[in-house]
Amino acid sequence: MKTIVFPATNRVHFSRQKLLLEELSKDFEVSVWSPSVNPDSGMAAFSLLCAVEFQNFLAKKEFDFALIRADRFELLPIAGICAYQGIPIIHIEGGAETGQGV
């Protein structure tokens, strides 16, 4: 069975994608990854620490796909890690205009 990793770096990621993840689990083995680091550490530190944790998570298991939701700042290094490791990225809900957050 093909495997998908879903990095849920924000609590909203999992809640908004719950139905999609349930549907995907019918045909794929889905693993949800969440960082243990505190997002209050600042954008740069949070991104870096997420990337390190995610890389360590990927070292334990091979994945066929990575499902990346939205365009949050900490997902860029995570997507880069997937690209470096040859894991195809499925990117959803990206492309919204920036302005409210950073």
What are these regions (language model features)?
Residues 1-36:
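N-terminal subdomain of nucleotide-sugar transferases
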Residues 7-10, 14, 39-102:
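Active-site and donor-binding regions of nucleotide-sugar-utilizing enzymes
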